[in-house]
Curated annotation (Swiss-Prot):
Keywords: Magnesium, Metal-binding, Nucleus. The gene is INTS14. SUPFAM superfamilies: vWA-like. Component of the integrator complex, a multiprotein complex that terminates RNA polymerase II (Pol II) transcription in the promoter-proximal region of genes. It holds the Pfam family IntS14_C. GO terms for biological process: RNA polymerase II transcription initiation surveillance; snRNA 3'-end processing. Residues 373-394 are annotated as: Disordered. This is Integrator complex subunit 14. Mg(2+) binds at residues 10, 12, 86. Component of the Integrator complex, composed of core subunits INTS1, INTS2, INTS3, INTS4, INTS5, INTS6, INTS7, INTS8, INTS9/RC74, INTS10, INTS11/CPSF3L, INTS12, INTS13, INTS14 and INTS15. The core complex associates with protein phosphatase 2A subunits PPP2CA and PPP2R1A, to form the Integrator-PP2A (INTAC) complex. INTS14 is part of the tail subcomplex, composed of INTS10, INTS13, INTS14 and INTS15.
Length: 518
């Protein structure tokens, strides 16, 4: 899951720290030392993590947008200036903005707040923000809890005794409470020094950034793998005394199911499954990063020559169009499948079902599934016209199906521009034009974005007025027809806003080629 590091650069972070030796340190230097340690660990063991760096005092600034380049993040740590007073609320508002712009409100995110425990002074201080928390309007609400799933880790460049001498610790604990209790406060044990700062950040790494290694098994075949992001324990709400359930480190494949049968099931989370190659001495050579490029290339070459069950499984699932059912724990299952990342690249993914003996109703109980060879006759029928499962979903979804994503403005802009490009090439691109138009129409109706339909209709009418004299007469009719259909759908009338309805091309008698026109 993405990480936002929020660094306090107010004047209080420049307070000197008495450290053994002649060199003078500030609390800011201790924080930079700890973050450098964190970034080095993530570059080696958590390199798929997207991380952003935000600095704040009375205002906030995005120093490094979300990236996997940890060298850039470490360079930014040495380029931070000192500013004025602390205002935590503005920093938390900044975190809300950058996370929602990049990832939306559904992706879990970890926020690492590095500060010295000073709450600021006057209006804008954390004391003032918490004191007025219950007196705010909805338009001026406090940024916690975050509008996305999150965990807030507060790294204090102060020891517990210093924080308890004021109300700083109570206010910081209130932040965790406001974030639905998701997070933790870390303080320096003992005097402020580099060693104790390393120990504090080491606790954060152990808690939140330890890679999840497991053994993937299928019969006698095994493979060491890393599951990313790390699966979080799941708490069953129905239990009287809920106990977090964690997945086993032994992931055993219990069978294979056709991808058409498993359809598009509800899942708790999705994870990459990455093989961990071992060299001849038994040491790991992947998926970490080595310092020397030549050593890295040679290690990858060695790893590429060693047979790996995880690679075999990935290729087999991709070719056969099947998924592997994997047991995560007692009465807890998931599935392994190949997901295309691009036309030439795909990844082995693992999705976690909800715990229980029957996570997918249309498959029945997992424990009662068996191989086709045990059946007296082909359960799918001789012509593949029936199913052995008790309940079939109405619509079977394909994992290769293109999904309309408008998380960023650029995604919506691209889809609209695609329609306009095809509109200028009518009637040759009639089929493509209506295909893209219906895709945008369905997405707009699904999101309740009716104003978009009105806006695209206006654009099509404008394109109609800009057609050159040499344009085919059918183009004007098709553009006018499409614009009218979108305007009708934008009114919200039920008979015109059916999701399954498609706008069909207008039937005309115009010839389609220049030869026919002559």
């Amino acid at each position: 899951m993405p990480t936002v590091v929020v660094m306090d650069v107010s004047l209080s972070m420049t307070r000197p720290v008495s450290v053994e030796g002649s060199e003078e340190y500030q609390r800011k230097h201790l924080a930079v030392h700890g973050l450098t340690m964190l970034f080095e660990h993530m570059a080696t063991n958590y390199k798929l993590e997207f991380t952003a760096l935000v600095v704040f005092s009375s205002l906030w600034e995005l120093m490094v947008p979300f990236t996997r380049d940890y060298n850039t993040l470490q360079e930014a740590l040495s380029n931070m200036d000192d500013y004025d007073k602390t205002c935590l609320e503005s920093a938390l508002l900044g975190v809300c903005n950058i996370v929602q712009q990049e990832w939306g409100a559904a992706i879990p995110c970890q926020v690492v707040l590095v500060t010295d425990g000073c709450l600021g002074i006057g209006r804008g201080s954390l004391r003032h923000s918490l004191a007025t928390h219950n007196q705010r309007s909805e338009s001026n609400r406090f940024p916690l809890p975050f509008p996305f799933p999150s965990k807030l880790y507060v790294m204090c460049m102060a020891n517990l005794e210093e924080l308890q001498s004021t109300d700083s610790l109570d206010c910081l604990e209130r932040l965790i409470d406001l974030n639905n209790g998701e997070g933790q406060i870390f303080t320096i044990d003992g005097p402020l020094c580099l060693k104790n700062v390393q120990s504090m950040f080491g606790k954060l790494i152990d808690l939140a950034y330890t890679p999840f290694h497991a053994v993937l098994k299928c019969g006698h075949l095994t493979s060491d793998v890393q599951v990313f992001p790390r699966p979080e324990p799941f708490i069953i709400d129905e239990e009287i005394d809920p106990i977090p359930k964690a997945i086993n480190t032994d992931l055993e494949i219990v069978g294979f199911v056709d991808i058409a049968d498993i359809s598009s099931p509800p899942v708790l989370s999705r994870h990459l499954v990455l093989p961990i190659a071992l060299n001849r001495e038994g040491d790991e050579v992947g998926p970490g990063i080595t310092d020397d490029t030549e050593d890295e290339n040679s290690a990858n070459q060695i790893a590429g020559k060693i047979p790996n069950f995880c690679v075999l499984l990935h290729g087999s699932l991709k070719v056969e169009g099947m998924v592997a059912v994997v047991q995560l724990g007692p009465e807890w299952y998931g599935m392994l499948y190949s997901q295309a990342d691009s036309k030439k690249k795909s990844n082995l993914m693992m999705s976690l079902f909800e715990p229980g003996p029957e996570p997918l109703p249309w498959l029945g109980k997992m424990a009662q599934l068996g191989p086709i060879s045990d059946a007296k006759e082909n359960p799918y029928g001789d012509d593949d016209n029936k199913s052995p499962f008790p309940l079939q979903p109405k619509n079977k979804r394909s994992y290769a199906q293109n999904v309309t994503v408008w998380i960023k403005p650029s995604g919506l802009q691209t889809d609209v521009q695609k329609i306009l490009r095809n509109a200028r090439k009518l009637p040759e691109k009639t089929q493509t034009f209506y295909k893209e138009l219906n895709r945008l129409r369905k997405a707009a109706l699904a999101f309740g974005f009716l104003d978009l339909l009105k806006g695209v209709a206006d654009m099509l009418e404008r394109e109609c007025t800009l057609l050159p004299d040499t344009a085919h007469p059918d183009a004007a009719f098709q553009l006018t027809h499409a614009a009218q259909q979108l305007k009708v759908a934008s009114t919200g009338a039920s008979e015109y806003t059916a999701y399954d309805h498609n706008i069909a091309p207008l039937q005309t008698d115009f010839p389609t080629t220049s030869t026919e026109r002559m």
